[in-house]
Amino acid sequence: MRAAWLIKMTCAYYAAISETKVKKRHVDPFMEWTQIITKYLWEQLQKMAEYYRPGPAGSGGCGSTIGPLPHDVEVAIRQWDYTEKLAMFMFQDGMLDRHEFLTWVLECFEKIRPGEDELLKLLLPLLLRYSGEFVQSAYLSRRLAYFCTRRLALQLDGVSSHSSHVISAQSTSTLPTTPAPQPPTSSTPSTPFSDLLMCPQHRPLVFGLSCILQTILLCCPSALVWHYSLTDSRIKTGSPLDHLPIAPSNLPMPEGNSAFTQQVRAKLREIEQQIKERGQAVEVRWSFDKCQEATAGFTIGRVLHTLEVLDSHSFERSDFSNSLDSLCNRIFGLGPSKDGHEISSDDDAVVSLLCEWAVSCKRSGRHRAMVVAKLLEKRQAEIEAERCGESEAADEKGSIASGSLSAPSAPIFQDVLLQFLDTQAPMLTDPRSENERVEFFNLVLLFCELIRHDVFSHNMYTCTLISRGDLAFGAPGPRPPSPFDDPADDAEHKEAEGSSSSKLEDPGLSESMDIDPSSSVLFEDMEKPDFSLFSPTMPCEGKGSPSPEKPDVEKEVKPPPKEKIEGTLGILYDQPRHVQYATHFPIPQEESCSHECNQRLVVLFGVGKQRDDARHAIKKITKDILKVLNRKGTAETDQLAPIVPLNPGDLTFLGGEDGQKRRRNRPEAFPTAEDIFAKFQHLSHYDQHQVTAQVSRNVLEQITSFALGMSYHLPLVQHVQFIFDLMEYSLSISGLIDFAIQLLNELSVVEAELLLKSSDLVGSYTTSLCLCIVAVLRHYHACLILNQDQMAQVFEGLCGVVKHGMNRSDGSSAERCILAYLYDLYTSCSHLKNKFGELFSDFCSKVKNTIYCNVEPSESNMRWAPEFMIDTLENPAAHTFTYTGLGKSLSENPANRYSFVCNALMHVCVGHHDPDRVNDIAILCAELTGYCKSLSAEWLGVLKALCCSSNNGTCGFNDLLCNVDVSDLSFHDSLATFVAILIARQCLLLEDLIRCAAIPSLLNAACSEQDSEPGARLTCRILLHLFKTPQLNPCQSDGNKPTVGIRSSCDRHLLAASQNRIVDGAVFAVLKAVFVLGDAELKGSGFTVTGGTEELPEEEGGGGSGGRRQGGRNISVETASLDVYAKYVLRSICQQEWVGERCLKSLCEDSNDLQDPVLSSAQAQRLMQLICYPHRLLDNEDGENPQRQRIKRILQNLDQWTMRQSSLELQLMIKQTPNNEMNSLLENIAKATIEVFQQSAETGSSSGSTASNMPSSSKTKPVLSSLERSGVWLVAPLIAKLPTSVQGHVLKAAGEELEKGQHLGSSSRKERDRQKQKSMSLLSQQPFLSLVLTCLKGQDEQREGLLTSLYSQVHQIVNNWRDDQYLDDCKPKQLMHEALKLRLNLVGGMFDTVQRSTQQTTEWAMLLLEIIISGTVDMQSNNELFTTVLDMLSVLINGTLAADMSSISQGSMEENKRAYMNLAKKLQKELGERQSDSLEKVRQLLPLPKQTRDVITCEPQGSLIDTKGNKIAGFDSIFKKEGLQVSTKQKISPWDLFEGLKPSAPLSWGWFGTVRVDRRVARGEEQQRLLLYHTHLRPRPRAYYLEPLPLPPEDEEPPAPTLLEPEKKAPEPPKTDKPGAAPPSTEERKKKSTKGKKRSQPATKTEDYGMGPGRSGPYGVTVPPDLLHHPNPGSITHLNYRQGSIGLYTQNQPLPAGGPRVDPYRPVRLPMQKLPTRPTYPGVLPTTMTGVMGLEPSSYKTSVYRQQQPAVPQGQRLRQQLQAKIQSQGMLGQSSVHQMTPSSSYGLQTSQGYTPYVSHVGLQQHTGPAGTMVPPSYSSQPYQSTHPSTNPTLVDPTRHLQQRPSGYVHQQAPTYGHGLTSTQRFSHQTLQQTPMISTMTPMSAQGVQAGVRSTAILPEQQQQQQQQQQQQQQQQQQQQQQQQQQYHIRQQQQQQILRQQQQQQQQQQQQQQQQQQQQQQQQQQHQQQQQQQAAPPQPQPQSQPQFQRQGLQQTQQQQQTAALVRQLQQQLSNTQPQPSTNIFGRY
């Protein structure tokens, strides 16, 4: 403390000197002394570090500390300790720059090298001491946290090598036994530190670093939030916690696992979670909802990206850039290199989307399930490899899967897939919904593939269902309907099931599901109503391929069920979803899956008879099928000559009508194909897979047996085709492909065996069977291409079948199809090109030239021979002939070709349209075309002639046209079927037909050419048939409505393959031509229609693509007018899945396909709508602004499946808009976008806020809710696909809308409130935020405007809040917070723009601060929003700070440093003195401010401030009580305060309500002057009384001559400005003898007595060190003259007599507030001073004596003088010392009705916390004081009042009691230091005795006291004797002087007596104080005299001798009064 005082005085001295210089240099003492202290500390630290640093030999400080320290190190440590304590004192006193000092402390630690644990351990307490200061700065806390986390991580890294260190430490240290038992309890939560805590070396380090880190976490979490920094290397991107391997809450704590520790850990975990959320928010720039783990917007973006990748991928080909690997990389990224969090959140959404994509009817293709299974299998393998190590990455998938299944761990995606089944998977609820059925079948197929690829575990699925109770079962038997829905069902699904769930209680349902005991004849008795859905499975001996399943049975099944599709699933509709899934999901029929099969059987059927019956049902249907396959008469090589393999007629199973009749007449014991299929489709998919697996195995065995020569039986091609159909129907796609490839591999051996047996089937059987195989493989080409090995097998097998015909130009249609497929395989798969290039490359071009060459139509008109081949055409199946010869004759004879073509067409068009016959004729023609290539041109020509029949014979084939009426609608279907089969068999190219026949015909009709309409109608019918893919069942049972369609599924598949090969241009040509025809206004149409143009197509809209319903439309649609029919055909074509998919994919790649001069802009847009939304009505163009309505409709109907369509529509609109209308269009798009958001907000769905809460990780909710998959969430991604000009307009409109919502007036008017809430709810939507942020990308010119707009909006919100506009209701306040959050999120999205500009940074920082200051957002009302604002502010501040730390140029460093300081100053100024929890968090972001002392000032009660800012009295002040009121708070620098000195600069009397009054000479003063010896008055200047007496200089042996010096100089008034120049008095010579001894005694010895300069006195009062050594003790002589010349009186108080000699009353000071808290040091009691008197600077040194005097009342003082006199004569009685008790008349007389101004605020700087209440015990300390206890005064310990020449009347104010408390700065530390300010120590408001005070003492007296305190009582007695002897000697000398000058002698003698008594009194007081420090306080008088007059004093001292009293009074009267210089005031 003394050192700090000296530093302060030195600083002030040099500052004063520099003021006098001409060139003034202002030095900041804070920074200057911070640098001095830190520099010195650093030097000492370097010396210590050198010692503790491990030496080259590796001997660290550990070993070296055992020996004695080197001297220089010991000195350095001592210096370090002292200087560090001094720094701590100065830091707490506010004398240092706190920020700089803490930064230096931090840098010291950062410079400690990793190995220097000794040094770290030595310095760690320093860090802990300042930890409470560090957490007040987030910047410093962040750096400190980085240091702690890195050190802790280093300690953990070294744990492995730590054991040896523990041993060595224990061997060298004596400590190991004590800490060893403690770590187990303290480190239980954190096992990684267990070893470290066992080590005495590391234990304190771990605890210390952990403590600091946890302190930062609790007190300054902002320092640990993830941050990004653009430049600064020290403010790194990330969080300090990134470096810590465990959470801070798991770090060790010393208290073990106590309840308190657990409580702290819980709080730590809570804050950790908040830090995580805040960090994620900063990472995404607060752009999305931070509460959700999977942010909706981000996840939606990922999902849409995945969908876009899937849509753009071509699954028909495989090459490097379009393979499954590339698809997987585009969807999941390049391998699992992302962190686990991303895998869990984003991958879940992607996996769910893949499942949806595979299941949804919004996309098409059976390949989707296999693609998803393959993708997930690859992804799973990647993650497995990542987890198990790269060594397992190359393992087989089976090993990985079996490993994962053998262990209890599920496959990676099991949970996600189960969640998908719980929430999003389709289920059967509505029997009328076709889409629902399709999606359910797709789901079964998907999970069939997932189970096959080990991505989904059926076993674990079943176990989960059982554990959850989803498959509750009771008694054995079929499972009854579940009485409850699946608890995991999603809410929306529960709503959908509402209707069915009510039926679940119906007992009849469970009865209807029972299996009849006689189920052995289940399939023979089809009339029974209880045909169970849960068909039994085969026992596990069946090892088939996996099987998807199909919903089941109708209650009343007729033999040919008419409503098959609806009926098969009847019972399932009432079942919970998981019952449906468990029933149908197939399980692979392998040995490893036997457990799952048995488990499924038991779960569904129990273990009794019903399970056996279920098994038996499967066996029965399998037996029936095998009976058909193995019946006699099947293809035996010696009996099959009369059978045409492709058209068996009698044995067909493909639904011929005649065949049906014949079969019904046969005995029922032998099943028909229809019966088998009817039974088959009633099975579940699981059972269907089992059946087909066994049957296909049987067929394969037959063929293998024949190939090996062991059998003569071959299965018929039709039988194989039938099995193909069954497998396809059961969705056993993988099994179907495997079966086909196995058959294909056997075909070459079968062909060789047929040759060996010389069978007639040579060359036909294998090619016919191969054609069926090719048809299947072509149909599932996208599935086949996923497996390269299978592709290679297929290619080799096909080459083996047709190798003999590769070089022939002719061949059967089957061979043509096989060659064409080989060509397609080769060109679509780069893998095959690489493998078979040499073999097939030459042949490839030949195939292209023969099969895929364009053909021109023939226009021949030859002589027609009506009888040519008429018999063959009438019954093709009954005739056998060789195609080769017939083909050759047709090739050579054009007339025969012409006749054959005309006759064939005549039979097709004019016959009775038997479907089978049409099919047979078409196949015959196809076979002949294979052998006669020229027929292709004829077919094309004749079709052109028919379609363009209006061309008047220019197309040829006039004979046919004369006999066929093209307008006859009855043959259109037959002709269309005929053409379709020709195209399927590669006789015609679909493109050629479109180019040559269809387009000309349609355009002719569109141009209204005469008679063109019938041909155009025929063209439409053919095109419709060619573009549609009718999916007929294997057995056509709809006998009542015969339709002409393609009978063989083989041909249907081949036709579909032809559709896939067509180029995109041809498809668009057809669509445009039909559209133009439908739009044309046709003249003379012979057809009328009653319905509207859009109604007819709607009939088809809901009907799906079933071709069998075509007959029902012949009346309603085909007889309509041509334009209506054309529209119907166009819509029907567009409704074909493959057409829509091809068009959309093509348009996405090149949107110019619809840019055609034939189409107008509106037509192109309508055609686009038809392509995009074929099942929806076209837009109505009516209404206002139809363009905007259309755009709005596009945006409103958005969902994830229609993103492509919406984007294409808008892009087409933009492309077709001319430049002059572009602005209008862009504005319409922008406004429509905003309207969509407004409507979304108004609907109450509040999709923004709702959706943000939806995607939780709960198992019961989907990864993305339906709200997020559609509507406004998708607007932003859609706009992002459009040109940037659109985004700019949308951004502008959004900004305008934001501004509309900012004027949120008070909610007084309902309409205004509604508008406000509407706007607010719109603007609070997260999707809207996403939209604006999306548009901002690349829109820099818009960013500035939007930022400015947002700034004004946020400002408006804050202003509205200030105006209390949100306090009326909670709802507006909530909306305001949402709107504010939205705007801040928008700003966050543009934060890089804000940070680029210093001005914008400052503006936004101030605004963000204003948000918090105004209370708009605080921690209590909305903590999430508060942390957003806080983190934004933190990023802005740190971003400014960061730049100056970076490695950029010096100039810009300074500039950025300046910018940072300016910003910090502005924020600090704005913060001001405001106090709240929220603002404390903000203060942490700013640099630590310099500490100041606060002084509270007063003003008269009722003061007002006028318009000019001047204070005036209030109007009603006359009637108000007089007094003072608190006015302002003044800040004073700690460097301006000097203990023991009263500088005039900082403090002003006016601050304390004093009023200047003129001093009146009191009557008592006049009377006293009359008592003077002189006959005249000798007034002297007041300065005379401030000077010490001119005493002679002090010598060792005072010579006699010097005694006259005081007399010589006595009359001279000493100069006021040189108090030290006065000669020493004789009093000094008295003390000479003791002084010599005292000088040699060390000052520190007196500390034992508690009165040394470094300690406080016994009552908490310390001696200021600056006064202990004062050079001039001469002021002792003025002891008697205490009356000050200034009188300060309270208002209305009667002034006491005595005038100028009354003691000056000390003015009241207002208390200070918010002083920095300091710990209470021992021996220092908080007290309250009773008065402060100011000193003139010139009077400083003369005041010393009074500061040294123990404060006693004047009466006592007189008594002491008497005692001193008597003692010298041996007359002193000790009993008289304590006799006097002041009478009550000394009490202060205050005016009635006024309460004294009392304050209990402890105002000292250092002795205790600011505002400490004074303990009441202080009021009873047994020391008397002249100050009245009734009116204690407030004192400011940090300022001194300047004394003015004239007195101030102190205005008395009401009681103003302060009870301010604050916490200590360091609760863990108590410095054994004394406060700096001693004389200003506040004392009790109850009137602490002045005698308690240990006042300032002269150096001689100080030494005297030190000696007295040091020695024992005997030495003290000796001292007293010596002092008495000296007193007698000096008294004699003084008497000689007095005899020479009597007046001077009396004065000197009185002073000597007074001094002697003072010494004795001090001695007694010290003894009493030592005795009373522990003694209880005694009551003290309640009143003491404030003003004492000498006359009055005489009457009060009645116990004294009258003579002595008169003598003293005479001496006093001889001396003029002088001002009091005791800064304690009068005692």
From Swiss-Prot:
The modification Phosphotyrosine is found at Y13. Its main location: nucleus. Residues 1463-1901 are annotated as: Interaction with CTNNB1 and GLI3. Pfam families: Med12-LCEWAV (PF12145), Med12-PQL (PF12144). Residues 1631-1640 have a biased composition (Basic residues). GO terms for biological process: positive regulation of transcription by RNA polymerase II. One of its GO terms (cellular component) is mediator complex. Residues 170-191, 474-516, 538-563, 1088-1113, 1241-1262, 1297-1321, 1585-1676, 1805-1848, 1965-1999, 2008-2027 are annotated as: Disordered. Coiled coil: none annotated. The modification Phosphoserine is found at S482, S512, S545, S547, S1105, S1116. Residues 549-563, 1297-1316, 1605-1618 have a biased composition (Basic and acidic residues). Keywords: Acetylation, Activator, Methylation, Nucleus, Phosphoprotein, Repressor, Transcription, Transcription regulation. Residues 1241-1258, 1815-1830, 1965-1975, 1983-1999, 2008-2021 have a biased composition (Low complexity). GO terms for molecular function: beta-catenin binding; transcription coactivator activity. The modification Omega-N-methylarginine is found at R1746, R1757. It is found in: Nucleus. InterPro entries: Mediator_comp_sub12, Mediator_Med12_catenin-bd, Mediator_Med12_LCEWAV. It comes from the Eukaryota. PANTHER family: MEDIATOR OF RNA POLYMERASE II TRANSCRIPTION SUBUNIT 12. Belongs to the Mediator complex subunit 12 family. Component of the Mediator complex, a coactivator involved in the regulated transcription of nearly all RNA polymerase II-dependent genes. Mediator functions as a bridge to convey information from gene-specific regulatory proteins to the basal RNA polymerase II transcription machinery. Mediator is recruited to promoters by direct interactions with regulatory proteins and serves as a scaffold for the assembly of a functional preinitiation complex with RNA polymerase II and the general transcription factors. This is Mediator of RNA polymerase II transcription subunit 12. It comes from Pan troglodytes (Chimpanzee). The gene is MED12.
